[in-house]
Swiss-Prot record:
This is Dicamba O-demethylase 2, ferredoxin reductase component. Its cofactor is FAD. The keyword Oxidoreductase applies. Belongs to the FAD-dependent oxidoreductase family. The lineage of its organism: Bacteria, Pseudomonadati, Pseudomonadota, Gammaproteobacteria, Lysobacterales. It comes from Stenotrophomonas maltophilia (Pseudomonas maltophilia).
Amino acid sequence: MQRADVVIVGAGHGGAQCAIALRQNGFEGTITVIGREPEYPYERPPLSKEYFAREKTFDRLYIRPPTFWAEKNIEFKLGTEVTKVDPKAHELTLSNGESYGYGKLVWATGGDPRRLSCQGADLTGIHAVRTREDCDTLMAEVDAGTKNIVVIGGGYIGLEAAAVLSKMGLKVTLLEALPRVLARVAGEDLSTFYQKEHVDHGVDLRTEVMVDSLVGENGKVTGVQLAGGEVIPAEGVIVGIGIVPAIGPLIAAGAAGANGVDVDEYCRTSLPDIYAIGDCAAFACDYAGGNVMRVESVQNANDMGTCVAKAICGDEKPYKAFPWFWSNQYDLKLQTAGINLGFDKTVIRGNPEERSFSVVYLKDGRVVALDCVNMVKDYVQGRKLVEAGATPDLEALADAGKPLKELQY
C-alpha cells in the first residue's frame, strides 16, 4: 500500500496552497495531493470571467506551472476520488480500488454544484460553471451556434456568467427566486445597482420567479418553463444556485458536521489527524460574531491551507484570517471586506449612478463589512475599520471626500 506523511484530498486553491506552504515552512516529509479533475491546480475565479470570455488561455490559470510540483517533490494522483476514510487505520480507499495510507489528512474538496431537482434536469445543455470541463463544454456549444442562454441563480457566479455572455452578444435571461439578486450576500443597495447594470447591458433579469421544469427535444434542453406556465426559449442553461459541500466520506467516517465539516480554531475535524479547509469547512468565524459558517472564497481556502501547513510543521496558531472577496462584471470591480451577517445599518459613500461607490455595513454602530464598487481606496482603507471594529461618526463616514483612514477607529 502506498502512503504519504501528508495526504491532501482536493487539488483546488486550498489543497494547492497547503502543499506549497508545507514546503515553504520546511516540511521534508512526503506529500500526496489527490484530485478529482485531470488537471493540476488552477485558479477557479477566472473560469466565469476571463477564461469564459477567452481573454485568458487555460495555461495562464495554473496556480503553479505543472513542473513546479515535481521540483518540490509533491506527488499528485489526478482523476482520482476518495470514496472511504478509515480514521483508525489512517487509510483511504480510492475510486480505482487502491488503498492509500496517511499520517496527516487534509480534506480540501470544496463542493459540488447544487443541481436542479425539477423535471428535465437531466437534459443535455444544462451546465454548471465550476470546472474547466464545465466551461469548455458551454463554450463549445456557443461556438456551435447557441444564441439563447438562461441563467438560473442570481448569485455572483450567475451574474458573472451573464455579464460575459451578454458582452459576447448572446440573448441572456437571468432568473432569481428571491426578490433581488445577491440577496444572501449583499444589502439592497448593491443588489439594486447590479440589477440595473445587467438590465442596461441587455440581460432579461427577472426576480421572484420559480422554475417549474426544463423542456427539451431529443434529450436536449430547448426551454425553461416557469411556475406560471411561460416557457423561455433556451439552447443552453447555466445553473448557479450554490454548492453542496463534498464531505460524504468524512461524515461516513464519523466526522462531525452537517452543512460542511465542523472544524475547531486550528482547522481540525473531530477525527484524529484530519483537518478540513476551504469551502467544505464550517468554523466559528470571528468576523461574523462567532457564528459557525462556511466561507466560500479563494482567500479563505488559501489562508486555511497555510494555517494547517504551519500547524503540521509545529507552528499551530488559531485561524484568524481576515475575509475578503472580489467580483468582476462588465467594467465594474467589486471588492468586499468583512462579512455583513446581521448588519442593522448601511451607509453609502459616493454615487451609484456614477458607478463608483461603497456600501458600509454596521452592526450596533460598528463597521463589520464593506462592498466597494470601483473604489479601491475605500476597500484598502476600509479593511482596517472592519478589523478594528471601528465606530466612526456616520456623517463623516458618508462623506466620500473624506478618506476612511482619517476616521476614528
